[in-house]
Amino acid sequence: MSLKARIQEDVKTAMRAHERERLAALRLVTAAIKQKEVDERIDLNDEQVLAVLDKMVKQRRESLEQYEQAGRDDLEAREQFELDLIHSYLPEPLGAAALADLIRSTITELGASSLRDMGPVMNALRPQVQGRADMKAVSEAVKAQLAS
């Protein structure tokens, strides 16, 4: 079952169980997926759905920080619930050691030696770490390894 189909099934399940908060969060996810499909005029595959979910996670984290600073516990709780729900659809995150090994092997495989080679390294890594690691952290780790 594709990721998009699984989300649709979970929407139906939440409707039947009268889980309002979960249903609202799932509808936000489906709306983001549909928006991307309409914008691009394509049916999204699992990899593209993961990219949409990654973007939503990043947005939720930023919102959480802002709500914490503003002391808005009510909004913070809702945002955290949405973040947890989105995380349930993402694959298991990569550990720091596994990520470092993957970066090292990709750099070796491509023969990258300087910061100029960062683009091809990131392009090779992106499909492997999409949804499993924060791309900003991956970028910083690649930059650090290429600089040394």
For each feature predicted by the language model, list its residue ranges.
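Charged, compositionally biased, marginally structured helical/coil segments
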Residues: 1-148
